[in-house]
């Protein structure tokens, strides 16, 4: 068996933040793959290569799944990202649906999946961790859009 999300990219754009500065473009790529024919894996990698210029890469993991399923998916995704030479400093792992698990499981998930990137646990149903995720996005946007005082050119 294998997993793949068959939907195409989804793009959302927020023109300005609350301070009226900048904006955020979010590209939601296809989902996880495993045990696929080579040509489909190559197509998936090609899709991911388009994301390499992103300021941030958020890897979402459904924390309500079985740990072994999460481990396999995470490991395969990390192998592909490593093969594509993704800058690890841009990578953040987002554990979703944490309202569906005992929050004490979060540390166990991080350990068992051997997650080496920053982790943010969120729940879209309860709002848990959403402020932290928004802060990460806005801080990264602010840093990228900050003007260099000496040249008045964006960094």
Residue ranges and their predicted role:
Residues 1-22, 33-46:
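Switch I (effector-binding) loop of TRAFAC-class P-loop GTPase G-domains
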Residues 21-22, 45-118:
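Conserved C-terminal guanine-recognition region of P-loop GTPase G domains, centered on the G4
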Residues 24-30:
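Active-site-proximal beta-strand elements of phosphoester/diester hydrolases
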Residues 28, 96, 123:
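Active-site glycine-centered loops adjacent to acidic/histidine catalytic or metal-binding residues
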Residues 30-40, 62-71:
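Flexible beta-alpha connector loops of hexameric P-loop NTPases
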Residues 99-152:
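Canonical P-loop GTPase G-domain recognition
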């Amino acid at each position: 068996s294998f997993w793949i999300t068959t939907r195409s990219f989804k793009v959302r754009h927020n023109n300005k933040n609350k301070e009226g500065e900048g904006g955020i473009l979010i590209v939601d790529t296809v989902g996880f793959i495993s045990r696929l024919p080579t040509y489909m894996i190559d197509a998936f990698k090609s899709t991911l290569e388009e994301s390499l210029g992103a300021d941030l890469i958020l890897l979402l993991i459904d924390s309500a799944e079985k740990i072994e399923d999460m481990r396999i998916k995470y490991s395969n995704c990390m192998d592909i990202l490593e093969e594509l030479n993704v800058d690890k400093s841009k990578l953040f792992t987002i554990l979703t649906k944490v309202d569906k698990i005992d929050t004490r499981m979060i540390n166990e998930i991080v350990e068992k999946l051997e997650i080496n990137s920053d982790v943010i646990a969120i729940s879209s149903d309860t709002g848990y961790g959403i402020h932290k995720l928004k802060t990460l996005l806005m801080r990264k946007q602010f840093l990228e859009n900050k003007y260099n005082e000496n040249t008045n050119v964006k960094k």
